[in-house]
Amino acid sequence: MSTAANDAPFAAHQSRGLSAALDYATGSHARAVVILLAFTLLALLPGFFSIPPVDRDEARFAQATKQMLETGQYVDIRFQDEVRYKKPVGIYWLQAAAVKTGEALGVASARTKIWLYRVPSLVGAVGAVLLTYWAGLAFVTRRSAALAALMMAGSIILGVEGRMATTDAMLLFTSVAAMGALARIYLGQRHQPDEAIGWQMPAVLWTAAAGGVLLKGPLILMFIGLTVIALSIADKSWRWIRATRPLSGFGWMLLLVLPWFVAIVMKSGGSFFTQALGHDMLDKITSAQEAHGAPPGTYFLLFFLTFWPGSVLAAPAAPAIWRARKEIGARFLLAWLVPSWLVFEAAMTKLPHYVMPLYPAIAILIAGVVEGRALAHIRWMVHGTVSWFLFPAGVALAVVVGFVLVDHSLGLIAWPFAAIAMVLSLFAWWLYEVDGPERAVLRALMSSAFVAITVFAVTFPSIPALFPSEMIAREVRATGCVDPHVASTYSYQEPSLVFLSGTATRFTNGAGAAEFLRSGACHFALVDPRSERSFVQRADAVGLRYTLVQRIEGYNISIGKPVVLAIFRSAEPQ
């Protein structure tokens, strides 16, 4: 890495501009909110409206919400005829409210506009960034709190979850709200143990806990509970817990969550708890679900990818964090982070987003060390900052390979944005020792925004083959049918097809697809090559007249395999 003073004037000017933006942000809380809001939207909006529904979790959540809107049944959760009792109702209600609002505002075909279902996740991600700033103010200066929030906003994991119509961005929002309130209660009691605590922070704590429970069950209570236990053991005192108003607070939380839980028990006869707690949560702890098993230590390794670019400073910050572990601020943040992290590492099922609610604690710890100029200068740690450049370079290579393999093109449209991301990250690494870690991470954060543009705004929308369901829905709409009905052979039964083609979408074999076409006009059968022979045989046997609408060649990203489907329709009403 260069330490010379004659590095590019562009980099110096850019560095001053980024630092000036942070200076402006830290001039007042209002300015900080404006800058954080602007950067978070810059990081999250690319591709938000243009990427089709992604299989499988996003499409399942969105389809279950769509069925609520279709049936008016807002207690029960279903995907087609199958009950979906893995998660509580919170995210479905939020998505339904977003779609209803879209309909009221005149959004055409609002119920099949996936971006409307993503709005709660976008709101949750933006809110989580702002709450990271608010939580950070309990521990560090305004500048460090803003830097921590920026690291959250630019992280890879939030960039993914903030664009997905799932629970995790909203869970992050409620978790940071709860932990920020708990931090203020704890620090207040440690600094002034005899001073009476007001009702505001306990109200935030327990209301956020209720929201988290309605989103993803008791997970948020684990974050709160393990933090409280760890702090009480470390302090050798449990007295401070009274300031959280546990009895009245827990009662308030129950008042908020029990109505729906009672309603779903009355509806399901207890099968919700059997599936949600027994089949979903406990099975994830004791066994690897859906091929997502991994050994302990997986989250530690994934962290350096999912929290990039902030994760690059984690190793240099670690020695200072360890030295400060007995300070009350660092103690709280470590209590927030370590116990829950160990639980996740011990669980058999592992997915990158599970530990996301713990990342704000890491961001605040790193930001505090950066401002305190306490980062370690061990050579291998300094050399590790090359990963600021390696990640965008790897993304650029992956984008080109993706275009070549799937779209059979070089993807030239993505090159300028990938180049900007690489240049910014190159300067972040190359001038790390010249300009210091704060300016370096700011450059890397700008690079992350251009990585997002490259991947989400340019690459994914430019390769339609990655989204076969969208291709199918477009071909079916092009026929002019007002109320089309679709059946697909079993080789392609993705939730996105149900979301885009209708709740009545059926899955069958080749012969069943031929029978389906006999049902009437505007019926379409999607037949894979292996099922086409049985389809033709059955069609000939029953005298079915049919036409080929189109052959679709795409790539099923949920299983990582190519997909080829012929779209047939009956030649005339039967």
Where are these regions (language model features)?
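Membrane-integral, polyisoprenol-dependent glycosyltransferases
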Residues: 2-380, 556-564
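Membrane-embedded architecture of ER/inner-membrane glycosylation machinery
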Residues: 2-25, 199, 203, 207, ...
